[in-house]
């Protein structure tokens, strides 16, 4: 959304070819933009489906779970085995306050529902966009949206799968 090109625009072909050659992952800012000059149509997660189909061996990440288009992001992740998503930047403020919980209760419910719909916990990753929300409170917020049985996957293992070179660094 910050550049006037869809993810499938040919301008990105060299990036995809290099990423494939060097076994790199391509991450996309999707969803809301932090700038009034950003163009939302270029940040819609459905554009990632086009790239996923054209490059089935390339790992792709839909950052921010495509918010506010979480239903579309969930479908792209569910459909394409090479697509991951992260849960970064989904809330701004102080989740520990009653005001925040009141404002975001519907949002948290919707997020939980679309994550469950996708049922691809092996391709859902924790992310923060810190300092928009304190790390401690954001972890608690995301944990409230993810069944406890999937916490290790979401908070750790999915990132190692999406970014395999990260695992080599951590070993």
Q: For the regions a protein language model found, what residue spans apply to each?
A:
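Catalytic pocket-lining loop regions of alpha/beta-barrel enzymes
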Residues: 6-125
């Amino acid at each position: 959304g910050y550049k006037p090109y869809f993810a499938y625009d040919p301008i990105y072909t060299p990036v995809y070819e290099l990423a494939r050659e060097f076994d790199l992952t391509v991450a996309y800012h999707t969803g809301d933009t932090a700038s009034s000059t950003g163009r939302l149509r270029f940040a819609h997660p459905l554009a990632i489906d086009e790239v996923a189909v054209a490059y089935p061996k390339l790992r792709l990440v839909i950052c921010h779970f495509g918010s506010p288009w979480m239903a579309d992001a969930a479908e792209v992740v569910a459909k394409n085995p090479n697509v991951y998503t992260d849960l970064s930047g989904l809330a701004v403020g102080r989740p520990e306050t009653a005001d925040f919980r009141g404002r975001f209760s519907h949002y948290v419910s919707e997020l939980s529902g679309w994550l469950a719909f996708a049922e691809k916990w092996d391709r859902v990753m924790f992310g923060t966009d810190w300092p928009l929300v304190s790390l401690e409170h954001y972890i608690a917020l995301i944990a409230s949206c993810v069944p406890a049985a999937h916490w290790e996957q979401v908070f750790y293992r999915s990132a190692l799968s999406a970014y395999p070179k990260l695992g080599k660094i951590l070993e």
